[in-house]
Amino acid sequence: MSPVAIIACVCLAVTLTSISPSEAIVPTRELENVFLGRCKDYEITRYLDILPRVRSDCSALWKDFFKAFSFKNPCDLDLGSYKDFFTSAQQQLPKNKVMFWSGVYDEAHDYANTGRKYITLEDTLPGYMLNSLVWCGQRANPGFNEKVCPDFKTCPVQARESFWGMASSSYAHSAEGEVTYMVDGSNPKVPAYRPDSFFGKYELPNLTNKVTRVKVIVLHRLGEKIIEKCGAGSLLDLEKLVKAKHFAFDCVENPRAVLFLLCSDNPNARECRLAKRFYRIA
């Protein structure tokens, strides 16, 4: 799940004068207050009948999170940097409801329906607290940069992806039963399955033998050319990888529920008019 609109800035700690405007990223203001506020909101009001609460309180979680990147050169971070935080924030995920996604952030989350149908990483406590936030460490006090974060493209990949890579790994490791993976089958520039995606690098490799089946949903965007189909191209590569891990594999293209979701935004699309006839929709 390569988090679109999710920026965990684990950036190179350089002086502000060396950062050009085009490279600057503005960090989230009052990061600690935002973190603690989201944490308390989650604890009291979010997913109460869907996901369990964690044992650590919000202050303890903040300490583990802040300790992971503060007073450090961000380019020296790796996937183990946030280990204590994810251990403290770990939740037991409901069986048969874990969902992964690549390139279909909005559609996947609309389909998951805030945990009612599926659980996404962004529905878990770590994902909910840090989604869309920006932060970066520095060696000088107060340990993190409050004004500007540089672009982290110069950092090694393990540093750039230290937070969300570990988040994806931990999330996948907790999955049980059937898992669902939604991909974009209409993108001419990017394969539906990529080995270098978050799913390819962190999630698929960390699925345990508690998983029984991987169900792939291929989303074909309305009015756009179909680029990839089940059983061919990168999806055939994915099928082989899944079966090599001894999981059952299913693949479907624009299933009825997904098509209806797409048609809710564009009911006059050709595919939607045909669906109305086929499914006898009013």
Curated annotation (Swiss-Prot):
Reactions catalysed according to its record: NAD(+) = cyclic ADP-beta-D-ribose + nicotinamide + H(+); nicotinate + NADP(+) = nicotinate-adenine dinucleotide phosphate + nicotinamide; 2'-phospho-cyclic ADP-ribose + nicotinate = nicotinate-adenine dinucleotide phosphate
Activity regulation text: Activity is presumably regulated by its sequestration in vesicles before egg fertilization. After fertilization and upon NADase release, it could then be regulated via its potential phosphorylation sites.
Keyword flag Membrane: no
Cited InterPro entries: ADP-ribosyl_cyclase (IPR003193)
Gene Ontology cellular component list: cytoplasmic vesicle; plasma membrane
UniProt PTM comment: Has different isoforms which may be the result of different amounts of phosphorylation.
Disulfide linkage: 39-58, 75-155, 136-149, 230-251, 263-272
Keyword field: Calcium, Cytoplasmic vesicle, Disulfide bond, Fertilization, Hydrolase, NAD, NADP, Phosphoprotein, Signal, Transferase
Taxonomic superkingdom: Eukaryota
Cell compartment(s), UniProt: Cytoplasmic vesicle
Flavoprotein as UniProt keyword: no
Activity at various pH: Optimum pH for NAADP(+) production is 5.0 from either 2'-phospho-cyclic ADP-ribose or NADP(+), activity is much higher at pH 5.0 than 7.4.
Annotated EC: 3.2.2.-, 2.4.99.20
Function, as annotated: Synthesizes cyclic ADP-ribose (cADPR), a second messenger for calcium mobilization from endoplasmic reticulum; ADP-ribose is a minor product. Synthesizes the Ca(2+) mobilizer nicotinate-adenine dinucleotide phosphate from 2'-phospho-cADPR and nicotinic acid as well as from NADP(+) and nicotinic acid; with NADP(+) as substrate preferentially catalyzes NADP(+) hydrolysis rather than NAADP(+) synthesis, about 70-fold better at pH 7.4. Has cADPR hydrolase activity at very high enzyme concentrations, which is probably not physiological.
Name this protein carries in UniProt: ADP-ribosyl cyclase/cyclic ADP-ribose hydrolase
